Amino acid sequence: MYKQAGDEKENKLLSVVHSLLFSIHETELQDFVRGQCTGSCIRHLLVKLLRYSGYDAAVCVSKWQGFDKIPGGDHEYIDVIIDNDLTGPERLIIDIDFRSHFEIARAVDPYGTLLDSLPVVYVGTLPRLKQFLNVMVDAAKWSLKQNSMPLPPWRSLSYLQMKWHSKYERKGLHSEQQEFQGASPSHALCFGHLKRLKSSLRLELETGRLLMMPVMQAGTKRTAMYERRRRRSLLSF
């Protein structure tokens, strides 16, 4: 599932996001302390670094009212506006904690494998994001059914779509920079979040390299075989 790669612009932005996240040190998060942070400091700093890199990036906060059996809520993520000469500006979504949206109780092994195949950080369009949501909601229903458990409202397709499809406020760089006076309990969680994020990204990239090795080795063998045949052909003249 993770191999559903985006286009060139998405892949380039994904590479930039990975590099910037690896470059962040926990001491840099101090400028964005603001109460219960829940990773907001990481997102604001990433937006700052993306803007320095020339991207039109912003933190987006979506909010929605509950309806029927769907609870209300809010969500914070990042978007980047990319110029497209053919279709006009294109909006790409960045979610730095993507897998957490699909975690469920007592998940069966196949679901856990599918969850681990998701990108650690999502970078892409809303239509491609919706494809992920559809697949994961169906898989979650099946997994929960194996344990005779219902799908909770906050894992329904309607609720998940509200996170990125609801009306949102696009914010610039966080202006309320505060002096860091030690790691508060809430902000200390962000240090752990950043550490786990980097660790997961390293594992993802390493796994990707291992998966590519057989393909690269096969390509090398084909090249070597072609070269031997070419040389024999030249020597036969």
Which stretches of residues belong to each language-model region?
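Intrinsically disordered, low-complexity regions enriched in proline, serine, glycine
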Residues: 59-61, 69-70, 91-95, 103-106, ...
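Short acidic loop-to-beta-strand element that houses the catalytic metal-binding Asp/Glu
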Residues: 72-95
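Acidic, Ser/Thr-rich intrinsically disordered and amphipathic helical segments
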Residues: 12-19, 41, 45, 93, ...
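A short acidic/basic microdomain associated with nuclease active sites
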Residues: 51-80
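Conserved beta-strand elements of beta-rich interaction domains across eukaryotes
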Residues: 57, 62-65, 83-87, 97-101
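Eukaryotic intrinsically disordered, low-complexity regulatory regions enriched in Ser/Thr/Pro
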Residues: 123, 156-237
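Catalytic cores of nucleic-acid endonucleases
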Residues: 97-162
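Interdomain/boundary linker segments immediately adjacent to catalytic/signaling cores
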Residues: 1-51
